[in-house]
Amino acid sequence: MSSSADNSNNSSSRFPAAVDSINNNSNSINDASQFHNSYNEVNEINNDTNSQVNNGNNITFHVLVSLKEAAKIIGPQGNTIETIRRENDIKIGISPREKSCSDRLLNVSGPPRQVANSLGQVLRVLTTDYEPEEHVFKHLRFMLPPASKEEIEDPEKWKQIGNLRLICTNPQISSVIGQQGAKIKKLIETHTVKLVASKHFLPDSKDRVLEIQGFPTSVANCINEIAELFIQDDVHVPPRTLPRYYPHSKHTKEIQVSQTLAIPKEFVGALLGVGGNRIANLRKFTKTKIVIGQDPTENGDRIFTVWGNDQKSVKLAQTMLLKNLEVEKKRREEHEASLKDGSSVPAAAAASAATSISASGANQNDSIHTPVSDNESPVVFTE
């Protein structure tokens, strides 16, 4: 296999250095970013009989997968995962699906070479007929951007590049990085893959995500060498006292329910308010997350997506947005009418419009009014 250094003239990609374990040495990060990646495709598994990983040691890898990815790995009637198990003579399984949980764990145990090979097969399954996903659970979102067209000119080859999210303990992450990032640089160069480790722990655990991107066979060879590093550094068996990550519903309480609203682009500014103050207050009051699409639709609308812990919160935010929109429309209509009549909008009409948007039919005395500028309609939040 030729190294990425031999093919650096064919690629402009730089390796990510988002690994906080080497952040205390800025020079090592800068060095890491100088390596180039050509995503060399490897057709054969590297079977090194002299490697320590083939001396009777077993290893277990945990992979974070989405519900959709888990379904692909299992396959119809469980045929896909059974084939991987049979061909590699390993233990492989997926954690039970938890209610209101968006992720599952793929667990693979056995001799390191077979485990690495099976994970290469898993990646090949995931890249077949791949469709991008939008993930609410932030740890499911890939840290590495997709390979660029400059890196892989052949569209069919480009489709074969995929990502795996290995779940590793902090000592395991340190083992992969090595002194001054030397080991992770070598892994990247040798196997022409991309590697990045998350800066933060997974919820309720001391585990982090180690993401690997590349061709399935290249990723398999990289994982095999990672297994060897774990065994050499004696970090392949995590301490029993270490909190390990597992999917459970409380992890996904952050955001579960979503609704979209189409807002005419000419009203977006009024709904956001000066400096985004109005939408910020609405988010805080309803305990929701509101994301505004950047590009208008064919109808000239901007899409507001509301995320929340429950349907009630999302519905409240949706109702308040729509009422704010109605008030703004009415305010503009009255303003236009006043210009035609040569008179100003009566203050009583504006006050009446303000009280009409109190959520859940609350009394006016129970309302919290946000500051209103000359160009904004009033917004009322009920307690």
Curated annotation (Swiss-Prot):
Localization, UniProt: Cytoplasm; Cytoplasm, P-body; Nucleus; Chromosome, Telomere
Summary of subunit composition and partner proteins: Binds RNA.
Gene Ontology cellular-component annotations: chromosome, telomeric region; nucleus; P-body
One family name in Pfam for this protein: KH_1
Domain KH positions: 58-122, 161-226, 256-321
GO molecular function term, any single one: RNA binding
Principal subcellular localization: cytoplasm
Function: RNA-binding protein involved in the correct localization of transcripts in the cell. RNA localization is a widespread mechanism for achieving localized protein synthesis. Involved in structural and functional organization of telomeric chromatin and regulates silencing at the HMR locus.
UniProt entry keywords in alphabetical sequence: Chromatin regulator, Chromosome, Cytoplasm, mRNA transport, Nucleus, Repeat, RNA-binding, Telomere, Translation regulation, Transport
Residue span of region Disordered: 332-383
The species this protein was found in: Kluyveromyces lactis (strain ATCC 8585 / CBS 2359 / DSM 70799 / NBRC 1267 / NRRL Y-1140 / WM37) (Yeast)
UniProt biased composition (Polar residues): 363-376
Keyword Cell inner membrane attributed: no
Biased composition (Low complexity): 343-362
GO BP, sorted A to Z: chromatin organization; mRNA transport; regulation of translation
SMART domains in UniProt: KH
SUPFAM superfamilies given in the database record: Eukaryotic type KH-domain (KH-domain type I) (SSF54791)
CDD domains from the UniProt entry: KH-I (cd00105)
Protein name (record): Heterogeneous nuclear rnp K-like protein 2
Family: Belongs to the HEK2 family.
Alphabetized PANTHER family for the sequence: KH DOMAIN CONTAINING RNA BINDING PROTEIN
